[in-house]
C-alpha cells in the first residue's frame, strides 16, 4: 500500500506540512503539485524549492492539470504540463476531472497519448468514480473514488471488471476521515482493490490542504 499525496496548500502557509512530506517522500506513490489550480502563469519560488527538495528525497512529482471533463482545450492542457515540467521538473501529470463515460473514452485516449509524447512518464486519471473499463488501460493509475468518508463506508460499490485488473492500477482518495480511523481507511482501500490511497481528515472546500496522517502511521 502506497500513498498518493495531493497537498494543496502553499509552502509559505504551512511549511511544516511540506517539511514532513519531504521527510516521508520515499514512502509515497507520488505527490501532486498544484500551485494555482494548475501550474499558474509564472513560476512560484516556494514551490520550486519544495519540488527540488522532494525530488532529492526520491519523490515522484505529478503536475496538477484540470481537464474539465473533456471540455478544456487540449492545447491548454499541454501548456500546463509543459509549465509543470519546466518550472518544477514534474515526472508526469495528475489529470483531474476526466470523463468516465464510454463516449468520452476516445478523447481521453488521445489526451493521454499526447501527454505521453510530451514526456509524462506517469499519468494519473481522476474521474473520481469507477469509469468505463477502457479508462484503466490508458493510465498508470486511475482514481476510482474521490469523496467523503461517510460515502466511502456507506455507498461504495466496486464493478466486477476491476477484479481483473492489478490493484496497483487503482487509487481511492477519501476525505473527512476521522484521524483515529485513517489506518482503517488504508486497510479498506486495500480490501476494495486499490493498492494506492490518500485518506485525509480535511473537509471541503479544500480537504487536500492538510497532509495525510497515514504518512505518520507508516513510520510506526
Where does each model-flagged region fall?
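Glycan-processing catalytic domains of CAZymes
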Residues: 1-220
Amino acid at each position: 500500500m502506497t500513498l498518493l499525496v495531493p497537498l494543496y496548500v502553499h509552502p509559505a502557509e504551512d511549511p511544516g506540512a511540506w517539511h514532513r512530506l519531504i521527510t516521508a517522500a520515499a514512502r509515497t506513490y507520488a505527490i501532486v503539485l498544484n500551485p494555482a489550480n494548475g501550474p499558474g502563469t509564472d513560476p512560484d519560488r516556494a514551490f520550486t524549492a519544495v519540488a527540488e527538495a522532494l525530488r532529492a528525497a526520491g519523490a515522484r512529482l505529478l503536475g496538477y492539470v484540470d481537464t474539465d471533463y473533456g471540455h478544456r482545450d487540449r492545447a491548454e492542457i499541454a501548456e500546463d504540463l509543459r509549465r509543470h515540467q519546466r518550472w518544477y521538473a514534474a515526472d508526469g501529470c495528475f489529470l483531474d476531472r476526466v470523463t468516465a463515460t464510454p463516449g468520452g473514452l476516445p478523447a481521453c485516449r488521445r489526451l493521454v497519448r499526447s501527454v505521453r509524447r510530451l514526456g509524462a512518464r506517469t499519468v494519473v486519471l481522476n474521474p473520481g468514480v469507477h469509469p468505463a473499463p477502457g479508462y484503466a488501460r490508458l493510465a498508470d493509475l486511475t482514481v476510482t473514488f474521490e469523496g467523503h468518508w461517510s460515502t466511502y463506508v456507506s455507498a461504495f460499490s466496486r464493478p466486477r471488471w476491476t477484479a481483473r485488473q492489478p490493484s496497483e492500477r487503482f487509487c481511492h482518495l477519501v476525505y473527512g476521515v476521522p484521524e483515529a480511523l485513517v489506518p482503517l481507511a488504508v486497510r479498506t482501500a486495500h480490501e476494495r482493490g486499490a493498492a494506492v490511497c490518500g485518506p485525509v481528515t480535511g473537509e471541503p472546500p479544500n480537504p487536500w490542504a492538510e497532509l495525510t496522517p497515514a504518512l505518520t502511521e507508516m513510520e510506526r
